[in-house]
């Protein structure tokens, strides 16, 4: 009886594997003969612009500014700035952009700019929570600092890290409610 069950199970497995193989070959070799354009947007930007999905649209950012667009291409908001190396962080409906090795960071939501933080030390990393609070790793001569900023860009707290003490942070992350820093 056990050998009969084993044979039936083996046959079923072989049939399933064969079906998966045949379907994957058909999909891989399918030749599309036409397409339909459902929407298009003209891009009139510089080559250094980068795009990233955000909320129910996308964000375009570069050294000169950041803009939020709906998927239809309609501009919702636009903010100019001057950054050498902009880096973005997204969490839910909040986005932060900071000038890496610079000293400014901006916080936005789907309605526009919420806050701006100016630092006295170079920014190494930026993270944002869903509520718009920002955490930044800052570089000093003998230490690094992890600063938390509220939605308006005001510093909430600062944690000093040294190589001989806690070590330098390689990466940070904050929870969506900004209550946990890792």
What does each of the following model-derived ranges do?
Residues 7-24:
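Hydrophobic membrane-insertion alpha-helices, especially the h-region
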Residues 142-182:
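Extracytoplasmic/periplasmic C-terminal soluble domains
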Residues 1-5:
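N-terminal Lys/Arg-rich, disordered targeting/topogenic segments
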Residues 58, 95, 134-135, 178-181:
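Hydrophobic beta-strand positions that form the internal "hydrophobic ladder"
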Residues 31-44, 73-80, 112-118, 155-163:
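A short beta-strand motif characteristic of beta-propeller blades
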Residues 44-53, 82-93, 121-132, 166-173:
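Repeated scaffold domains used in trafficking and secretory/extracellular systems
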Residues 65-67, 103-106, 142-148:
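Structural motif
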Residues 50-101:
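Extracytoplasmic/periplasmic/luminal assembly and interaction segments
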């Amino acid at each position: 009886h056990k050998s009969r069950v084993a044979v039936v199970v083996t046959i079923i497995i072989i049939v399933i594997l064969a079906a998966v193989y045949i379907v994957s070959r058909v999909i891989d070799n399918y030749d599309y003969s036409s397409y339909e354009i459902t929407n298009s947007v003209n891009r009139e930007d510089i080559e250094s612009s980068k795009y990233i999905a955000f909320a129910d649209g996308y964000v375009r950012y570069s050294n000169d500014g950041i803009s939020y667009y709906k998927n239809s291409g309609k501009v919702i908001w636009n903010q100019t700035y001057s950054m050498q190396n902009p880096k973005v962080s997204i969490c839910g409906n909040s986005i932060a952009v900071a000038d890496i090795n610079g000293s400014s960071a901006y916080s936005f939501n789907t309605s526009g700019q919420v806050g701006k933080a100016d630092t006295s030390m170079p920014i190494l990393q930026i993270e944002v929570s869903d509520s718009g609070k920002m955490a930044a790793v800052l570089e000093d001569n003998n230490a690094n600092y992890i600063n938390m900023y509220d939605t308006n860009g005001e510093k909430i707290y600062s944690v000093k890290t040294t190589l001989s003490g806690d070590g330098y942070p390689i990466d940070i992350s904050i929870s969506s409610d900004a209550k946990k820093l890792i």
